[in-house]
Every structure is written in C-alpha cells, then in structure tokens.
Curated annotation (Swiss-Prot):
Gene from which the chain derives: tvp38
Region (VTT domain): 156-265
Record localization: Golgi apparatus membrane
Family to which the UniProt record says this protein belongs: Belongs to the TVP38/TMEM64 family.
Functional summary from the UniProt entry: Golgi membrane protein involved in vesicular trafficking and spindle migration.
Membrane topology, record value: Multi-pass membrane protein
Provenance organism: Sclerotinia sclerotiorum (strain ATCC 18683 / 1980 / Ss-1)
A Pfam family: VTT_dom
Protein name: Golgi apparatus membrane protein tvp38
Any one annotated GO CC term: Golgi membrane
Disordered: annotated span: 374-393
Biological processes per GO annotation: mitotic spindle elongation; vesicle-mediated transport
Keywords (A to Z) from UniProt: Glycoprotein, Golgi apparatus, Membrane, Transmembrane, Transmembrane helix
Length: 393
C-alpha cells in the first residue's frame, strides 16, 4: 500500500500535457483582429448588385415591365388616397373633360384642321412671322413658363420640317443659355426655392462632377420640364455656360420628332381631298413618332438616374475608405502597421514563459528541487503506523 501510494503521488506530480513551445513571433502567427479583416465577398456582391452596370444576372424585360406597372399602380392608389374630397372631385371632372375633348377631336377632326389651315397660311406668309415663333420658343425657356413642346409642334405645323426645325433649334440654344445665366444670377433665389429640393436634380448634380459634357447631353435628352431643367442645371456650380450651350446644340436633332408630328398635322389640315390610306399613314407616323420620342427619353432618363445612383455608391465607398463597386479590390481596410500590432501585443497578457521576467508559478517540477511528496504524508503514515503497533503491544 505505501508503495502504491508513492507511485500514484509521483504520477500526479507529472505535467498534465507536454510543454508546447510558444510561437516564435506572436505578431506573425496571431490571428488577424476582427477590425482588420477584409470586406467579405458578400458585401462586394451587394455593392456590385447595386450598380446598374454590374455583371449580375438581371430579370427579364417582361418582369421588369410588370414590376414597374405594379409600382406605378401602387403610387397612383397612394396619391389618390392622399387627396382631399375636393381634389378628388376636381380630378374626376378633369378626367371626364379630357375624355370629352378627345371624343370631339375624333369626331370633328376635319373641321378643326380645316379651320387651322388658313391660320397657318397667313402666319407663313406674314413677313418676319418666323420671328414670332422664335420669340415664343425663346421665352418658354425661362422658369416657370410652359408651352415649349407646343411651340415646336406649331413650328412643324406652320413651316414644315426643314425650316421649322431651324427656327426652334436656334431659339432653343439661345433661350436655354440665357435662361441658364438668368437662373444663376438675377433669378437665383427663386430658382433655388423652385428646384433646390427636387430629388431628380440632386441626383443629376453628382453625375455632372464625373461625366461632364456627356451627362449634360443626357440631361437635355431626358423628358424633364424644359424650363425647370434649365433652372436646375444652373444651380450646379461645375457647369460652365458654354458647355451647357454646346450640350443643348448637340441634342437639337431630337426636335425633329416634334416638328415632324406638327408637319403631319399640317398635311392633314391642308389636304381636303386626302384619301383614307394617306390619313392613316399620317396618323400612324404621328403615333410612332410620339412613342419613339417618349421611349427614347424614358430610357435615357432611367440610365441617367442609374448612373447617378452608381456614382453615389462610389462616393459613399470612397468616404468609408473602400473602393468603387465593379472594380478590382486592390487594397481594403487593414491594420497592417507592425508598430501598432507590437504595441497591442505589449498590452496583451501572455501565458508563455518570458526569460526577461522573474519566475512565476508553474505546474512543472524542477528536478533540483525537493519532491514535496517525498516527505509529508508518507512520514506521517509511518509515524501513525508505528504508534499503532506500540499501542497494540
């Protein structure tokens, strides 16, 4: 029994596990702290999916149309519910009035065009009559006036495609430039109050800082209110008046659509003996031209706003120290400074032995030291056993 107890005591004195050598360089082998980890691929995918030019698979065109139609329906329902009773009554009256006017136009279209034909001829034969149309188009460029599209259609109705387009094109460039300068100077207070909080123009302001003349041309092609767009662009300090005039001149070919529609209306008004097939061709050309202009304008508007959103994401990433989406991640946020890591290592509590520090408590037995189990319980047991024998005797 004493021998077994002694061997058991020695076994308990042995280390529980073998001594593991500490890492040679805690800085090199330690795990990266959580604040220095790179951005995960999921986050990059989220940024890339937000970009309209990313390579992520998109939904079909049919699904996009259905989704946009559903969104438009919900917006209309919400807008209708927010109207007061008086506003709802006025909206119903306006809808009924529009239906009546369309019906009257379809029934009495020949009489309407016949009455307009002499008016167009007198205007065309009037000396300097084109200056009236030029002045009307020029004035329509200043906010908050309306009627710009009507003046272009009248130009085609009265003067036809070549001459009518030349009149409105030159007037558009001159009017837009003057409206731009006026909105930046004498009308600046009114313009900021009018369009300063418009989210559409706030988004376009960011794109102008990156894309310059290209985005200016896209803005001029967008189906935005003509006079309001002139005023809004004037609030962007990065736009130069000459660049704005150049962009307006570059997109004047779009006016051919409106002028062409006006010329077709003039043909319907001036030719009383036109057969049905010719009338149908003119009507079809009007519908196709209008639809083409609306579609192109809508597509350009969507792409312009998408570009604005992409640049907004890039600005946010640049502010946070990240890189733009869709580009190769060259360097991301990381605490790679060895000095900082060394300072952090000094503050940590190390469980490894350090030769530079005084000796600390250890569970390992030094061979030079006396075994604590060599004396103590064994001697006491021997003493107790001896006393027992003496007592028995």
């Amino acid at each position: 029994m004493p021998a077994d107890y002694s061997s058991t005591a020695r076994a308990l004195a042995l280390p529980i596990s073998p001594l593991e050598s500490p890492p040679s360089s805690p800085i090199q082998h330690a795990e990266r702290p959580p604040w220095s980890r790179r951005i995960s691929s999921g986050v990059r995918r989220a940024y890339n999916s937000a970009s309209p030019y990313s390579s992520q698979p998109t939904t079909s065109f049919k699904d996009q149309i259905l989704r946009k139609a559903d969104k438009l329906q919900r917006k209309c329902i919400t807008a209708w519910q927010n109207l007061s009773t008086l506003q709802k009554c006025l909206a119903i009256v306006a809808a009924i009035l529009n239906i009546v006017l369309v019906a009257l136009f379809l029934v009495y279209q020949h009489q309407i065009f016949a009455s307009l034909a002499p008016f167009a001829e007198r205007w065309r034969d009037l000396p300097g009559g084109w200056m009236i149309l030029w002045a009307m188009t020029f004035v329509a460029a200043f906010p908050p006036l309306i009627g710009y599209s009507s003046t272009i259609t009248i130009a085609g109705f009265v003067y036809g495609v070549p001459k009518g387009w030349a009149i409105v094109a030159t007037s558009t460039v001159a009017g837009s430039t003057c409206s731009f300068l006026a909105s930046r100077t004498i009308l600046s207070t009114y313009v900021h109050r009018l369009v300063g909080k418009d989210k559409r123009f706030e988004a376009l302001a960011l794109t102008l800082k990156h894309d310059g003349i290209k985005i200016l041309c896209m803005i001029r092609l967008c189906p935005l209110p003509y006079s309001l767009s002139n005023a809004a662009v004037a609030t962007f300090p990065t736009v130069h008046p000459l660049n704005y005039a150049l962009a307006t001149a570059l997109v004047t070919p779009k006016l051919f659509i409106h002028v062409f529609i006006g010329s077709r209306l003039g043909s319907l008004a001036g030719n009383e003996g036109m057969d049905t097939s010719t009338k149908m061709i003119n009507y079809a050309s009007i519908v196709i031209g209008g639809g083409l202009g609306a579609t192109v304008g809508y597509i350009i508007y969507q792409r312009t706003m998408a570009r604005a959103k992409e640049l907004e994401i890039e600005e946010l990433e640049a502010a946070n120290g990240d890189v733009a989406p869709g580009r190769r991640v060259a360097a991301e946020y990381s605490d790679a400074n060895n000095d900082d890591a060394a300072l952090m290592n000094d503050d940590d509590i190390s469980l490894w032995d350090n030769t530079d520090e005084p000796a600390r408590y250890t569970d390992f037995v030094d061979e030079d030291e006396a075994n604590v189990f060599a004396s103590g319980d064994l001697d006491e047991e021997a003493d107790i056993g001896g006393r027992g024998k003496m007592t028995r005797t």
